[in-house]
């Protein structure tokens, strides 16, 4: 699999192994002759996304096949050794491929029952899910709603790799806040690997305190600091990451058909 991974990075190699048939010209008895070459990879043109790589046979490894399938921009390799026949090695490979694809799901990045509506810079209204409530550093008690830069986005994940988690990093926000303004970053992980990352953006306006309000807030913070009281509202995460694996899974990973 590692050899295939590296080899398929070469565009010429990929072009050759993904071709099911071609004709080349050779010299034969002093004249040019056409020779038709046909791949022994029967999956090419017959299995969605099949793009190589190599059939083979050895006494110790038996009927072999290193298969590659590309879907949604990602290549999946199925390596088969010691299959029972030439035909069976392809069935073995597609069985492995199908198992992976049947356990691959579209996982929405946003899971939030709370929504908010705001007016965009073009004058249209937009209703979006609330991902977090973000603290405004200019105030002691104010937060504003935020969403993802693309709240409809999803990512394909292999469900058996484990559940998805999120890490929300909030920016220090000051000044007037307008919808669409970046106020943080949300990173999504599966099995300790980053699977998606998006900007956290404001989903409503939040004016900064005016100079008079700012003076009052400064004094209030001073007194609050002496008494150990909170001097700024805390940001909070609204979005959840439902389980996709295990007995408590809440997302259905069973595919129909």
Question: What does each model-identified segment do?
Answer:
Residues 1-257:
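Domain-terminus/edge residues, biased toward the C-terminal soluble/receptor-binding domains
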